[in-house]
Amino acid sequence: IISSHSNKAHDGFLGHSYVGEWVNIGAGTSNSDLKNTYGTVKMTLGNIEVDTKLNKIGCFISDHVKTSIGCFIYTGKRIGVSSHIHGYITEDVPSFTIYAKSLTGKSFELHKNSAMETQKRIMERRNITQTSNDKDLLSRIFKMTQDERYMFGVLKTDFSM
């Protein structure tokens, strides 16, 4: 399922997955939807591991996510709101995270204002005006997910490679 205003124009496999709104899937981004063991997919929800009892589940990509060229997302992984992902995604990614662990060994917090500016730019490309409600929603999600970023070890410093 690919929601409105999302872009998957390039090569790459995207199977048995959910993609939120305003997502850009970079060229060559692919996901796995089947474990090498052919076993059922287990996902983490909160602090609880849940057996889905399904052997085919792709990824779950939240609104405003951007994937860089050549991302590989492992089976059943969740990508949080406004995250930017790079390289191999082997674990769930919190909202507002620049995930570059396979490249730098680290993840960085995406500044809220940067997320809002990116939202504005992508909406303008579709002749849609960003509203105060759009910005307020991102602000609220940013605040609601700050503990998740802390627990994940996301660095509150500028991203660099």
Language model feature labels by segment:
Residues 1-156:
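Glycine-rich hexapeptide-repeat left-handed beta-helix
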